[in-house]
């Protein structure tokens, strides 16, 4: 838990410092997303698992067409799967909680001041595990503390009023590190994945 607070303090410091950069465009505010999460496993049938995130977001752009963004969010992830058994299907629900920090390199389309600006982005995503349950039992010891993945997305930013932006996008995230600890009973590579709709309301430091 102490490490969790240290991560939050460091990232808040980064956010505050970023607002003092000499670039022209900085927006910051709250972010929320929902979608489907899964863990890759070739021997199971995947079902829907609601994945939610909530936290803070900041975007910095030194010109009107390219920028960088970072979020600090709590994310619920995991999988809802079925495995064929002798007596029938075996249901397995894994719920993972992460402090997740996705970074984005963004390409903005259109011009600054347009009422709607489409965008595309890509970047890495880092996660720190804070909770894990398998079928409602605590299984945190079976999962690795750190996770990393890549994400890509498309979306649009809309001006609500002066300096207030509504940001929406659809993001696909694919893990690249095994989320489970290797053992004699588990030697497969299991990767996090998710598809989410992201919504954030951001305040800009520059008038349109």
Enumerate the predicted regions with their spans.
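Residues that define the transmembrane beta-barrel architecture of outer-membrane proteins
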Residues: 24, 46-52, 95-99, 116, ...
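Membrane-spanning beta-strand positions in outer-membrane beta-barrel proteins
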Residues: 25-27, 57, 67, 104, ...
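Gram-negative (and chloroplast) outer-membrane scaffold detector with strong preference
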Residues: 32, 59-135, 198-208
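Extracellular loop and loop/strand-boundary signature of outer-membrane beta-barrel proteins
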Residues: 40-44, 86-93, 136-142, 182-187
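Predominantly the C-terminal beta-signal and adjacent terminal strand-loop region
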Residues: 71, 76-82, 115, 147, ...
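Short glycine/proline- and aromatic-enriched beta-strand/turn motifs that initiate or cap beta-hairpins
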Residues: 21-60, 200-208
